[in-house]
């Protein structure tokens, strides 16, 4: 797409996919887009105003992405760094033109490192030099810099120039004027040479040689002398000078730098993001015809205007505050691990993002330490409640002046652009941190011994009555206070940081915050929604609240159709003249706030939300334009951006001056500029000669310590001595150099190559800290290495909190400079502090120990953080005093709990496996009533990552598997519904009303059929609710997933899932299972006695039998559900038989044979004939169930038209009656399966692996699995607070059956580092009692042995601890309650003793597990629990012997790895069951062998994209299942005919089909084994 819009004859905007360039008739410049992480995605690009000006006219545009150096002396955290050698230039008429590095000189770190060469030929010595001096008015009037390119040869020069030859016009004594271009514009230097009337513009670009030929004919010029210069970016603060020692040969110099000194460009520029092409074209098309170019801010990046603001009073205020924050964070980094100060530390390491993270840090501290962020309970705020609650301190005044409110609006909204909704929370902090914002300056601000007093117009900062600093008041009349421990930061017109101990906490004295926008930022909408606070400017509080739940917030706005956003009640005294104007400001910034939240949402949520927000925002912007004060250009510009963004069609308001945020952020003035340290990444070279540093790029003046050197590379004498780190840190007095150059035997320590050693090193771990050792005798330009013993670090005891005069401390291989007042001495830490030595140039490094207990700060009254998103309560973290909980990046799946030390990190394998398995298990939840506000969640990634982009990549493979699983699951549900509907259709056809005599029994059966029809409809509706929006299934799962971070277990369900009266629970609570209507209520098995009236209905059509065939085919869809259908049909006559009479099918065949003696030969002949027919039919059906139905039709057509058909009707009636019962059983099985899933989830939450999650036969087959568990170090499991904990499974070494009880032996070959030998021996285990009538109906365990339970193995006693009591048995096979022994347990940690006692009897619900991995089955509890024990070495004495106690430090593995190949077969005879009538089941076992590729485990398979393909490949083998079905079906059909022929003459007779069903079971762990069971058995008894 290529578009061109010309809004004026002299301005064309070219738009294509690569960007856009503003082309004027003056020049062409392309700017670099700034990589800014927190910028708005819609307003991401920036542009600059394009001015029409004459050549030589002066522009006032500022750069949008860099920081200026506007003074010759920089303030570095309280001390000053001076620059020397000022350089200026003048006009040809001699008038001073400007001084270098004014407002147009910026410094920034570049993403890339530029390398450029300066080439000198014979007779030339090119010298690039950039110097700095004091600038008038902070350098705001300077326009250009000067780069002098001197000849420095023997050529004659103009008398007006300096020695050597200056390039340029002779009247320009200081050479040519230049500027450095941007990195994306071929970084280089553009310079102009004055030619008498105009300037000739040249450009020198990196990697390109240029020949600059000087004009000839004038005395003093460098006549026709070629000069080759190759240059790019400059190093910080100084373009280093290079020279050749000899002028008789050519030489070149290489400079590498990642810094750019940027000067003023002559023309403005714009780059458009590609994703904004269409929108921009649409918007600009509406402005054609506007003559003035006032739209340059359409796509203004927020970072642009924030970094450029200098008129708004608060910005200069926050700049020194950020510096003070950084100072504190460096000093107290060890103490503030839970606070946001480390963010400030990081931001100072990268100058490019300074405003972002400083304001980010400020708001994080401000809104998470002092104030309580309240979220509405039940979607409403209580009386006298706001989103932002103040501390329990008395504040005065609640009014605000009109004008100040307008200013505060503007100031507040700018910070919002950088406020990120992630926040860090500390309760009481490390030592009680506090932030205070005082808007109205008062005579005294007191906090214990700390005071700020107004004295003669200045602010005197006192501690214990002693003035520590004097600050000038800020123009905004705002003072910012920050306290961390006993360090105070105060920011007004300038800033300072002092140390003032705090012993008691008092209230603020006369602290008036009445005009602070921090606290007056909420407005309430009029209309029906009276109690919902509408955030207008509460950027911190409302931002935290609205970002995660913005959809919920928008629904509140939409509740009232008559809601008028223009009717805000601002809660301030509004004058009549300013009411509408104030209203306009409020609405503009409210719309701006919502727009920022909107643009920060992920795309999927943004699309959904946009339609809801658009009318509301347009309503906000519906006031008259005249209501906006045209002089307030900041609000006008925001208003224009909003109407462009949200589709307003009328023109923007035109204003007559630049908005505030188009000016530089840090303007001139001593102490306002920034200074940044950089860590140098060095390259290493191997030299076998004397070791040394190569040339330093520049020089290091040890007398003044002005500049940070830039090392090109570092060398060590031997290959094994490579200095991997070199760091240079500046303090006010010296440079501290840290070198890491360590070998296995000795270290090299740095000095100089000459005998005069000015630096010596201290060995501290793997680093060497170099500090001045003696006074330098010269200015050195290089360092060298030579072997020298390191100085010892003495340990010094001190009682001082602060060591005055010391310069900094070393911790974790990093040097941190201290405040000028001195270095703090922390308690319980090593304090390696550098202090002045015996002489002025000598410094020492010592380890200081505090010998007195530090002052304990009285903590501020705790303000708890209640994170209550509606209908979800996140309350698992208990915040206590002196503890800190850091919730870091919850959206990304990382939870760090400092209380327990547990970590849930998404990068490990344990995360992946538990992630997948846990979601698989809980993917069949009950129907949930979900809040309507969550109905728009449509993506798996949306739920898991919640907008976190980094998480999306990590969770992609998981969501792919989940999406496929959901497709299969939903398809299976649909197939089940279809099958049930078809069965009902068959019932209607085969049981017509005309064939039944409507007795009470038949009416009851008829009602059963109709009820079955209703049941199908209800089941279908229930499944449709489960399937229809995919979000419901997702949300049901994500409910558990969210709680995995919070440690909240799901509550137990109340009531039975099949009870006639469903349990009542709040449908609005995510935590409660919603009330469900049972699919079949009060189901009674109908009698199968049919009083058949002998009539001659029509023969069932082929379509009917086809429907039956489709029912049979639905078994495959049931397979994916993992259902087991047990059909038990009961006949009235059968009840009268004894169990022995119907125990075995062979007995019935014997009975049948007695009836068929005289007709046996005829039956046999008929069976042979039918058998051949069935065989032919089986061969011709060709795996098609439709052909099977045709076969049924062929057999039916052979029926006799009279008595045979009457019998068939009877049999069909009986068969269909059986189907009714079977479908009732099916519905119960569906619920039973759901209960099993739910119970399994509950068990997992309780740390229990119950039979609902794994069956005994699976344990048997885990032998191959467990063989791959390698022994080694103990591996931890997830924290107690995680919702899902997965224990490793044992090695099953043997299995046997003893007295109808299944026994398993197992061992766990784990060798721990703290235990000698293998932990566990082979122990027998008791799994389940097959004779218990409810052995398949496990419930949630009522008692669970806690995870800290140890286990004892005595000679013949097997013991486990429960509630401080050890329960022991004499033998693992003797679990009778009378055989229990009880040992009392002592709480003593050392030499704990256990004593056996014969009483009391134990709780029957306690299982014996832990280290021996027992499973105790209790009739009272109906549970079987498996757990894995521990391996910490503790002992106990019993009968003069010492036995080990296993403590819960090692609980096995987090995952199970299965090596290839693997084949798991299944035999379900081990499944215990006691149905009302015994079943004799026949099985058709189909086992698939799955071979995994080498080096691939199940974890990789489950989370791999190819997992789908593997499942599809397995599905191809289902053809074999169809063949099995055909064989069984043909056999059943043949037997059906055999029985019908045999029953000729035996009317009436009653046929009961005992079993007709598909029994399908899918092994959850492997996910690929499908076992199909199909059987049809018949019983007959003569009437």
Curated annotation (Swiss-Prot):
Residues 1575-1583 are intravirion. One of its GO terms (biological process) is membrane fusion involved in viral entry into host cell. It comes from the Viruses. Residues 21-1553 are virion surface. The chain crosses the membrane at residues 1554-1574. It is a single-pass type I membrane protein. Mediates the binding of virions to the host cell receptor and is involved in membrane fusion. This is Spike glycoprotein. The lineage of its organism: Viruses, Riboviria, Orthornavirae, Pisuviricota, Pisoniviricetes.
């Amino acid at each position: 797409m290529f578009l061109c819009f010309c809004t004026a004859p002299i301005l064309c905007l070219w738009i294509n996919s690569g960007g856009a360039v503003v082309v004027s008739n003056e020049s062409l410049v392309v700017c670099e887009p700034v990589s800014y992480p927190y910028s708005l995605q819609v307003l991401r690009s920036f542009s600059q105003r394009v001015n029409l000006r004459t050549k030589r006219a002066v522009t006032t545009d500022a750069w949008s992405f860099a920081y200026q150096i506007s003074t010759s002396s920089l303030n570095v955290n309280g001390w000053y760094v001076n620059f020397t050698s000022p350089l200026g230039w003048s006009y040809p008429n001699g008038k001073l033109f400007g001084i270098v590095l004014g407002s147009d000189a910026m410094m920034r770190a570049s993403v890339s490192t530029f390398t450029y060469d300066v080439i000198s030929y014979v007779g030339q010595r090119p010298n690039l030099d950039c110097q700095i001096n004091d600038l008038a008015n902070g350098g705001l009037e300077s326009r250009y810099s000067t780069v002098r390119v001197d000849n420095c040869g023997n050529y004659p020069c103009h008398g007006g120039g300096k020695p050597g030859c200056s390039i340029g016009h002779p009247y320009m004594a200081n050479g040519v004027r230049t500027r450095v271009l941007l990195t994306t514009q071929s970084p280089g230097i553009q310079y102009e040479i004055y030619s008498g009337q105009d300037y000739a513009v040249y450009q020198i670009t990196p990697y390109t040689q240029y020949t600059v030929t000087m004009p000839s004919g004038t005395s003093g010029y460098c006549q026709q002398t070629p000069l080759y210069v190759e240059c790019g970016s400059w190093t910080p603060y100084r373009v280093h000078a290079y020279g050749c020692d000899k002028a008789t040969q050519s030489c070149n110099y290489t400079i590498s730098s990642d810094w750019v000194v940027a000067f003023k460009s002559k023309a403005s520029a714009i780059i458009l993001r590609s994703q904004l092409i269409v929108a921009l074209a649409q918007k600009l098309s509406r402005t054609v015809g506007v003559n003035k170019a006032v739209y340059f801010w359409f796509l203004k990046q927020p970072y642009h205007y924030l970094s450029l603001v200098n008129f708004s009073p608060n910005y200069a205020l926050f700049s020194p505050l950020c510096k003070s924050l950084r100072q504190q964070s460096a000093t107290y980094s060890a103490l503030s691990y839970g606070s946001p100060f480390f963010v400030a530390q990081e931001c100072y390491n990268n100058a490019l993002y300074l405003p972002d993270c400083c304001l980010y840090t400020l708001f994080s501290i401000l809104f998470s330490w002092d104030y309580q962020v309240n979220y509405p309970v039940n979607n409403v705020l209580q009386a006298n409640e706001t989103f932002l609650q103040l501390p329990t301190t008395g504040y005065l005044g609640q009014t605000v002046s009109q004008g100040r409110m307008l200013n505060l609006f503007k100031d507040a909204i700018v910070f919002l652009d950088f406020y990120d909704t992630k926040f860090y929370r500390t309760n009481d902090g490390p030592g009680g941190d506090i932030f205070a914002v005082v808007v109205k300056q008062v005579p005294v601000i007191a906090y214990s011994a700390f005071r700020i007093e107004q004295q003669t117009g200045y602010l005197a900062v006192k501690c214990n009555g002693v003035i520590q600093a004097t600050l000038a008041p800020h123009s905004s009349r705002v003072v910012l206070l920050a306290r961390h421990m006993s360090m105070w930061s105060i920011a007004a017109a300038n800033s300072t940081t002092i140390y003032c101990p705090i012993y008691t906490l008092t209230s603020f004295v006369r602290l008036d915050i009445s005009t602070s926008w921090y606290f007056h930022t909420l407005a309430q909408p009029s209309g029906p929604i009276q109690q919902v606070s509408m955030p207008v400017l509460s950027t911190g509080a409302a931002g935290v609240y609205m970002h995660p739940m913005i959809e919920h917030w928008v629904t509140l706005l939409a509740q009232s159709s008559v809601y008028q956003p223009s009717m805000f009640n601002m809660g301030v005294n509004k004058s009549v003249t300013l009411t509408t104007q104030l209203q306009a400001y409020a609405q503009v910034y409210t719309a701006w706030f919502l727009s920022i939240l909107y643009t920060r949402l992920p795309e999927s949520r943004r699309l959904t939300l946009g339609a809801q927000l658009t009318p509301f925002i347009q309503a906000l912007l519906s006031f008259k334009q005249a209501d906006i004060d045209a002089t307030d250009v900041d609000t006008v510009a925001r208003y224009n951006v909003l109407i462009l963004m949200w589709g307003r069609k009328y023109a923007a308001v035109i204003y007559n001056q630049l908005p505030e945020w188009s000016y530089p952020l840090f303007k001139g003035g001593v102490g306002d500029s920034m200074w940044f340290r950089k860590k140098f990444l060095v390259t290493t070279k191997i030299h076998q000669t004397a070791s040394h540093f190569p040339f330093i790029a520049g020089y290091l003046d040890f007398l003044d310590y002005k500049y940070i050197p830039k090392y090109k590379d570092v060398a060590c004498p031997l290959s094994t001595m490579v200095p991997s780190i070199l760091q240079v840190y500046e303090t006010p007095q010296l440079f501290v150099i840290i070198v890491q150059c360590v070998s296995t035997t000795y270290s090299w320590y740095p000095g100089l190559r000459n005998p005069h050693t000015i630096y010596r090193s201290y060995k501290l771990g793997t680093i060497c800290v170099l500090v001045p050792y003696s006074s330098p005798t010269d200015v050195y330009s290089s360092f060298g290495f030579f072997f020298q013993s390191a100085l010892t670090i003495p340990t010094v005891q001190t009682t001082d909190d602060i060591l005055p005069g010391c310069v900094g401390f070393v911790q974790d291989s990093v040097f941190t400079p201290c405040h000028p007042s001195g270095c703090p001495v922390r308690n319980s830490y090593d304090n390696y502090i550098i202090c002045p030595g015996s002489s002025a140039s000598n410094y020492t490094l010592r380890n200081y120990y505090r010998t007195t207990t530090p002052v304990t700060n009285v903590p501020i009254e705790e303000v708890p953080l209640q994170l209550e998103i509606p209908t979800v309560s996140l309350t698992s973290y208990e915040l206590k005093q002196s503890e800190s909980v850091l919730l870091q990046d919850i959206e990304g799946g990382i939870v760090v709990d400092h209380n327990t030390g547990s970590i849930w990190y998404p990068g490990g394998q344990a995360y992946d496996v538990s992630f997948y398995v846990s979601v698989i298990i809980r993917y069949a939840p009950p129907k949930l009533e979900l809040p309507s506000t969550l109905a728009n969640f449509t993506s798996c990634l949306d739920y898991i990552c919640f907008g976190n982009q980094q998480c999306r990549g990590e969770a992609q493979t998981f969501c792919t598997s989940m999406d496929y699983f959901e497709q299969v699951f939903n398809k299976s549900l649909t197939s089940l519904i279809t099958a049930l509907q078809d069965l009902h259709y068959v019932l209607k056809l085969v049981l017509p009303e005309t064939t039944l005599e409507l007795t009470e029994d038949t009416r009851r059966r008829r009602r059963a059929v109709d009820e079955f029809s209703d049941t199908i409809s209800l089941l279908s509706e229930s499944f449709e609710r489960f399937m229809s929006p995919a979000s419901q299934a997702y949300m049901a799962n994500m409910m558990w997933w969210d709680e995995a971070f919070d440690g909240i277990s799901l509550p137990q369900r109340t009531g039975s899932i099949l009870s006639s009266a469903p349990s009542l629970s709040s449908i609005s609570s995510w935590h409660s299972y919603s009330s469900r209507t049972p699919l079949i209520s009060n189901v009674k098995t109908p009698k199968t006695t049919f009083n058949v009236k002998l009539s001659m209905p029509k023969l069932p059509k082929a379509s009917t039998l086809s429907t039956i065939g489709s029912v049979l085919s639905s078994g495959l869809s049931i397979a994916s559900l993992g259902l087991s259908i047990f059909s038990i049909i009961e006949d009235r006559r059968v009840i009268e038989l004894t169990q022995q009479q119907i125990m075995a099918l062979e007995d019935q065949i014997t009975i049948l044979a007695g009836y068929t003696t005289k007709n046996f030969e005829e039956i046999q002949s008929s069976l042979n004939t039918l058998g051949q027919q069935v065989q032919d039919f089986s061969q011709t059906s060709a795996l098609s169930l439709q052909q099977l139905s045709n076969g049924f039709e062929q057999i039916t057509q052979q029926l006799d038209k009279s008595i045979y058909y009457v019998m068939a009707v009877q049999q069909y009636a009986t068969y269909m009656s059986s189907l009714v019962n079977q479908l009732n059983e099916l519905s119960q099985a569906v619920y039973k399966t759901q209960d099993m899933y739910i119970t399994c989830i509950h068990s997992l939450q309780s740390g229990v692996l119950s039979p609902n999650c794994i069956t005994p036969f699976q344990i048997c087959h885990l032998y191959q699995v467990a063989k791959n568990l390698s022994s080694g170090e103990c591996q931890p499991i997830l924290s107690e607070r995680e919702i899902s904990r997965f224990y490793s499974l044992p090695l099953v070494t043997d299995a046997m059956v003893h007295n109808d009880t299944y026994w398993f032996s197992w061992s766990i070959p784990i060798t721990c580092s703290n235990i000698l030998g293998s932990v566990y021996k082979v122990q027998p285990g008791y799994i389940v009692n097959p004779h218990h009538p409810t052995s398949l109906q496990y419930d949630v365990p009522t008692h669970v042995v806690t995870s800290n339970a140890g286990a004892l193995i005595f000679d013949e006693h097997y013991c486990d601890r429960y509630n401080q009591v050890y329960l022991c048995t004499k033998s693992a096979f003797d679990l009778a309650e009378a055989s229990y022994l009880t040992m009392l347990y002592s709480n003593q940690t050392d030499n704990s003793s256990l004593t056996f006692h014969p009483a009391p009897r134990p709780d029957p619900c306690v299982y014996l597990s832990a280290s021996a991995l027992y499973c105790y089955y209790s009739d009272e509890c109906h549970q079987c629990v498996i757990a894995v024990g521990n391996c910490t070495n503790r002992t106990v004495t019993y009968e003069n012997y010492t036995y080990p106690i296993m403590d819960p430090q090692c609980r096995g593995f987090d995952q199970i790895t299965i090596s290839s190949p693997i084949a798991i077969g299944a035999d379900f005879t081990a499944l215990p069951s006691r149905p009302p009538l015994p079943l004799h089941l026949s099985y058709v076992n189909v086992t698939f062998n799955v071979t995994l590729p080498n080096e691939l485990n199940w974890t990789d398979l489950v989370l791999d994209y190819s997992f789908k393909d593997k499942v599809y490949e397995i599905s191809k083998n289902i053809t074999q299942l169809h063949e099995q079905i055909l064989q069984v079906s043909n056999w059943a059909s043949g037997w059906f005919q055999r029985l019908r022929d045999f029953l000729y003459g035996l009317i009436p007779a009653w046929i009961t089909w005992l079993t007709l069903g598909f029994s399908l079971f899918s092994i959850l762990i492997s996910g690929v084994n499908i076992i199909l069971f199909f059987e049809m058995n018949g019983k007959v008894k003569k009437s």
